[in-house]
Amino acid sequence: MKILFSPIGNTDPWRNDRDGAMLHIVRHYQPDRVVLFFTESIWQGNQHFSGQQAFDWVKIIQSINENCQIEIKCDTIEVENDFDAYKDLFHQYLVEEKRKYPNAEIFLNVTSGTPQMETTLCLEYVTYPDKMRCIQVSTPLKTSNAKTKYAQADCQEVDLEIVNEEESQQPSRCHKIAILSFREAIVRNQIKSLLDNYDYEAALQLVASQKSFRNGKEIRKKLKELIDDIKMHRVFSYLIKQYPRNEKLQKALLHTILLEMRHQRGDIAETLIRVKSIAEYIVEQYIQKNYPYLIIYKEDKPYFNVSYSQELTESYLALMDSRNKKTNKKMTVDSLDRILGFPAYRDFLQLLEASNEMTNEMNKVNEINNLRNKVAHNLDSLNLDRDKNGRKITNAVTAVRTMLLAVFPEVQENDFHYLKQFNQSIKELL
């Protein structure tokens, strides 16, 4: 089944003794059903044009398509030159046609009516292209409709015979248009929006759906490589080239970039869970750099070297004892033989350096530790408004970058913006 949905303008049903766009589509596509849309002003007319209600639309259409079913819709449009005025109305009518005739092919007349109507139908096609076709009809002289002789209702029967005679000797002026450039422009903007939100998988799916996309193969390759790197926590090739032979810096910088990406796109719970682990790794590098041999490794696990400094060992034991006052449990050197983590590193630096930039930033990470444990281990939901949790998480993410720069001062500021630079490179290919 074929259905034609057609707005009607002042150049319908004919002009200069030749078909208007709607009638020409009916003539050459022979639809089973035609839905005509009139604004009330077009239907009623004004001092310049007699209203379209004066024409016998059923008789005109059935003169060239005898068994065609015709439905007329007339609506009051308050602001006819508003591009949004027809969006919901046209969509509603087309949804109704699809629901009543699910297997029908719907032709959209994008030549008749106002520019606002034509654009709305083009957008409808771009958004919901399934089983729809946009039909454009050129003028007989392939020029505009300026200075044309409009149809007159009072002599429509005679004029219709003349029009049918003229058109019987002429080829079709209909053209199916895919509006690929229009559709691609919308898709490109959607992809750019996804890139701005770091939603690379959705961007890749959208690019893959556009077979004729300019630079599509290259864009898909770059997105796929980045997605795999993020999923597998592989260091970006850019970072490897930028900092060769410094694997620890590469890893710390990669995870800091990913942490900031997750925070910026709103993955707050994921950010909260990861921030302490990344901070722990960075602080471990700081201690190795500034206090060599304080940490020893057993099967790649970090332990406190109690032989590093008797003063530090005694101070650390005293600190542990002060925290165990309620249990009266005394710590011994043997009890310090356990895997180290962020809390222990924080204690060491507070004992060794008192207050400095590193310990201050560590405190910001430590401030969200209880919240992190509730989310990560108790599977609690996250309330950003309670106890200023949102601000505390932001402060912790910022602290990780500051800590990284304290350990690896050679890192450049623009390295943190690698993903934004990647996004821009994809946008340029688009």
Swiss-Prot record:
- Tell me the protein's name: CRISPR system endoribonuclease Csm6
Q: Which organism is it from?
A: Enterococcus italicus (strain DSM 15952 / CCUG 50447 / LMG 22039 / TP 1.5)
Function of this protein? CRISPR (clustered regularly interspaced short palindromic repeat) is an adaptive immune system that provides protection against mobile genetic elements (viruses, transposable elements and conjugative plasmids). CRISPR clusters contain spacers, sequences complementary to antecedent mobile elements, and target invading nucleic acids. CRISPR clusters are transcribed and processed into CRISPR RNA (crRNA). A single-strand-specific endoribonuclease (ssRNase). Activity is stimulated by cyclic oligoadenylates (cOA); maximal stimulation is seen with cyclic hexaadenylate (cA6).
Q: What is its EC number?
A: 3.1.-.-
- What quaternary structure, including any partners, is listed in this protein's UniProt entry? Homodimer; the composite ssRNase active site is formed at the dimer interface.
Keywords assigned by UniProt? Antiviral defense, Endonuclease, Hydrolase, Nuclease
**Which family, according to UniProt?**
Belongs to the CRISPR-associated Csm6 family.
The kind of enzyme this is, by top-level EC class, is: hydrolase
Lineage here is: Bacteria, Bacillati, Bacillota, Bacilli, Lactobacillales
Q: What else is known?
A: Encoded in a type III-A CRISPR locus.
Outcome, altering residue 116 to A: Loss of ssRNase activity in the presence or absence of activator. Does not protect against phage infection in a heterologous host
User: Where is the stretch described as CARF domain?
Assistant: 1-155
The annotated modulation of its activity is: Non-specific ssRNase activity is allosterically activated by cyclic hexaadenylate (cA6) binding to its CARF domain. cA6 is a second messenger produced by Cas10 of the ternary Csm effector complex in the presence of a cognate target RNA.
